[in-house]
Regions:
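Signal peptide processing junction and immediate N-terminal pro/mature segment
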Residues: 12-16
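Bacterial N-terminal signal peptides
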Residues: 2-11
Length: 181
C-alpha cells in the first residue's frame, strides 16, 4: 500500500517547481511588466527610482455578476536595501461585473511606513471601476484604479481578458516562506 501511495504521488512531486524556479519566473515577470510600464508611462521610471520601494504582481481574475475573485504572485522590492520579498496575492469582492481579466499591477510606495506595512501585513482595500478588452496584442484598455491609502501609486495593465466591472475589492498580499528562505 505504501509503495502505491509513493508511486501515485511521484508524478505530482516530480512536476513541482523548486523555490528558485518560482523566484526566477517572478523576476522575469517583473522585468516584462516594468518594461511595458516604462514604455507606456516613461515618467514611472523616475517615480519608481525615487520611491521607498515597489511591488509587481500578476493577477488572474474572474467577475461573475455580483462576485469577483482572483489570485497571483509577485515581488516587493526595497529600493533602499535592494532586497526582494516574494509574495502571493488573493482578491475577493462584490459589485456588478462580468468577465475574465489577466492583469499586472505595479504598486509604488512613496513612504517607508507604507512599504513596511505592505510587506509585513499585506492588506489593501480598493474601489475599482474599469473596462478592459484585450486578447493577445489586440484590443484596448481603460483603467481607473487607485488605492485608498495615500502615499501609494498603482498602475494596472491588462495582459489578456475581457471585463466590465465596478467592484469593491479586498486584496490580501502575503510573504511566501518557501520563496524567501
Amino acid at each position: 500500500m505504501s509503495i502505491f501511495l509513493l508511486l501515485v504521488g511521484l508524478p505530482i512531486s516530480a512536476n513541482a517547481k523548486s523555490a528558485e524556479e518560482d523566484r526566477q519566473e517572478i523576476r522575469e515577470m517583473r522585468s516584462e511588466v516594468l518594461a511595458q510600464l516604462y514604455q507606456n508611462n516613461p515618467e514611472a521610471k523616475d517615480l519608481i527610482a525615487g520611491a521607498e520601494g515597489y511591488a509587481v504582481f500578476n493577477n488572474g481574475g474572474v467577475n461573475l455578476i455580483l462576485l469577483s475573485a482572483g489570485s497571483g504572485k509577485g515581488v516587493a522590492h526595497d529600493n533602499k536595501s535592494g532586497k526582494d520579498v516574494f509574495m502571493r496575492m488573493a482578491t475577493g469582492g462584490v459589485g456588478i461585473g462580468l468577465g475574465i481579466k489577466d492583469y499586472r499591477a505595479v504598486i509604488v510606495f512613496h513612504k517607508r511606513a507604507m512599504f513596511d506595512q505592505f510587506v509585513d501585513k499585506g492588506w489593501d482595500f480598493s474601489g475599482q471601476a474599469d473596462a478592459a478588452a484585450k486578447i493577445d496584442d489586440t484590443g484596448g484598455e481603460a483603467n481607473a484604479a487607485d488605492s485608498v491609502v495615500s502615499g501609494v501609486t498603482v498602475y494596472q495593465m491588462t495582459k489578456k481578458g475581457l471585463a466590465l466591472q465596478a467592484t469593491l475589492q479586498g486584496t490580501k498580499y502575503w510573504k511566501v516562506d518557501k520563496w524567501n528562505n
